[in-house]
Amino acid sequence: MKLSLILSIALCSTRVVYAAGAEAPRISRNTVKLHSYNESRVCRHDESSNQTVSHAAMFTFNFQDGDGYRVYQVPRCLFNTHAAREVLSSVDMTETLESYRKRFRVYFVVPIYGAYRLVARSPTAKYPGGVLNPPPASSVTMQDLIVDATNIHTVVPDKLCVITEHPVIFSMKVPCSHQVITWTGYTVTVSLAQKFFVLTIKPTRDHTSENTLAMFFGDVREVDLKAPYTVGAFLLRQTPDHDLLVVVKQTAFIQRYMFLTDVVFLQRTLSADYADTSVCLRVLSVLASVVARGKQCGLITRDTVEFFFTYSLCQLMANGTRYQSTAPVSTALWRQSELELFGEFIRHCFKTTTPNPTPAFQTRMQLTEKHKPAHSSNAIDVRVLAATYSSGMHAASMADLAFLLRSTRIPPNVNTDALLQKLLFTTDAYYRMSLKIPLSGSMRRILIRVDLTVRTQLNESSVARRHFVLLTSMCSPREQISWGELLMNPQRGAPSEIYSPCVSGGRRDYTGPSVRALMESAHRPERRAEQVMSVTEALRPKRSQMSDEANCVPDSTQGAVITANEKTYLISSDFIVKGLAIPVSNTVVDRNLMITVLDRRSPCVLSRSYRERGSVIVMNNITFTERCEFCASTLVEYDEVDGLTSIMHIPSIEVLKYLTDPENDILVATPRVHYLLLTANGTVFEVTDILVNVRPSMPYSVVVALVIIAILMALGLYRLCRQKR
């Protein structure tokens, strides 16, 4: 009876109540005009009658009330509509009252005593930007860019999100984009519609929906709930603009999601001005910091749920942003690159088996009209063309563009060197500065984009290999110490902010004991070492994602990789892969050091025995000229007891002079410390005396003059000898 009353009230009343916005004009509450009949008829609702009533055009319900009847009527024509059939097919008309009551207890209902809160904007909720700010505006505007970036964040719905036969929610079909994040333990799904998103969290091994948490946020008026539930039953949070509904079974709530009733749940996110994408990204960075520092990668906790919620929210807010054609490109490129960087953070932190969940801009980018080829058959390499227009950009914006156009499985598969070549000057400058001072936040912001751009290019691009060896060289003991200090700052957590070249994948020789010893020697708390290793293991790429010649080496194997133009050096404690093995003899017992020389693009073959063996060529000193014959070589410092310590690339004569200057105190002259010079052609030298004499080469004109003088002297001596005969 109760269900019949609900249906009659809903269908015979013309007053429509919205969650927000204007009301429909008021008409008499209990009348519905039927235009499908010749004469006007009205349905009777809650009227008294002294006899039962029936009508061919109506469903009529007569309930005895004393000596009379209460009459309720529903027009038959309303049940012929698609909406009515959808409603009736979703409702069990034969359900008993007892079953109805039990069903109400199946799902978690938000308690009145404190979990539900209206979250207001907090003027004191300030999130310092740090490097999470757009770079300085450049002279390049949206209309100058070769690709249309005015809607750079907009993701066109390519799927239909469907909810059918749900115990709580009426059937719903909404155009959306669908992002799946899967790792050992859980599957997280972000379904992004135009006005709201749905975040679902489900244990991977659970093939039912018993433990699934669903969070609807945004303008959720399209979500209709079945009786006995109302919107208020699942309304966990409200802001002035949006609502949050949570749908989860009571047993799952008790076992897994009790944090939903925490008063501070989502407070940091919803109290900020999250409609501003830049602010949303800063909040997300703080949550990423909590997850990474708290060793919560791969877990489902209150902090990780807040992180995934805010990640979804930032995408929803950015999705509706449109930039003016005259606006500088800096803000748009920075925001999109940050969104995709957070996707990389998720992929590495949670060790997902799915790719970067952020929809890549390059999958939907289109050339602007003025850059489209005259004929469709003319292929245009976007990266080459982008490099020609990047001269007016700040280096940070150029790094954003290079990262957004990074090579993936999306054609073209080979990233040209155009943008990377322009960024090489910046990477080289930062490397030279890192020899003197710690890396700054703005440097790290650019270097992470360079790192993620070159990782997949180590097989094809010589420029990418030069970037990689510079990043490897920046991972020094000084960097480990300064990075440890940075990781202790709770306000820094975005991938851009906590990046270190030590997670680029070049140096895997740093271990827990070695980092602890380093921190102890620098008088740093032991917790610094634990933090450094925790973040390193969480964010460092797998070897399988690197260059071909060393991608089969297990990730657990310690060692360093140094890339030259046509050679790759693998430094480890033992022989691991097939290649030219060069043992290093100057180590103590039980401290082995092996250098394996590999050809670029050669297949990686695991092997514990070597057939090719080389040797280290010992040189008392090496003399360089201004032509820098050994430039593009790498100087490796190792300790007889502690093993590999520093890697220093030599890109230019200026760097060589700085490294060998005694006043800079970089090269150490002790009996335990040795230096190896790894050249570009695969030869390994040991410099025993740490003596490198840099002297200018003779000018060409002087050489020619000396040669002429020598010839004349020889000719004079020849004639003199003939005369004496």
UniProtKB/Swiss-Prot annotation:
Keywords carried by this UniProt record: Fusion of virus membrane with host cell membrane, Fusion of virus membrane with host membrane, Glycoprotein, Host cell membrane, Host endosome, Host membrane, Membrane, Sialic acid, Signal, Transmembrane, Transmembrane helix, Viral envelope protein, Viral penetration into host cytoplasm, Virion, Virus entry into host cell
Top-level division of the source organism's lineage: Viruses
Classification via Pfam families: Herpes_glycoH_C, Herpes_glycop_H
Transmembrane segments: 701-721
Virion surface domain ranges by topology: 20-700
Location of the region described as Interaction with gL in the Swiss-Prot/TrEMBL record: 184-247
Annotated glycan sites: 38, 50, 319, 459, 621, 681
GO biological process, one term: fusion of virus membrane with host plasma membrane
Post-translational modification remark: N-glycosylated, O-glycosylated, and sialylated.
Position of the signal peptide: 1-19
Topological relation to the membrane, as annotated: Single-pass type I membrane protein
Subcellular location: Virion membrane; Host cell membrane; Host endosome membrane
Residue intervals annotated with topology Intravirion: 722-725
Record bears the keyword Membrane: yes
A GO term from the CC aspect: membrane
HAMAP family: HSV_GH
Subunit details: Interacts with glycoprotein L (gL); this interaction is necessary for the correct processing and cell surface expression of gH. The heterodimer gH/gL seems to interact with gB trimers during fusion.
Role: The heterodimer glycoprotein H-glycoprotein L is required for the fusion of viral and plasma membranes leading to virus entry into the host cell. Following initial binding to host receptor, membrane fusion is mediated by the fusion machinery composed of gB and the heterodimer gH/gL. May also be involved in the fusion between the virion envelope and the outer nuclear membrane during virion morphogenesis.
Homology family: Belongs to the herpesviridae glycoprotein H family.
Protein name (record): Envelope glycoprotein H
Species, as recorded: Murid herpesvirus 1 (strain Smith)
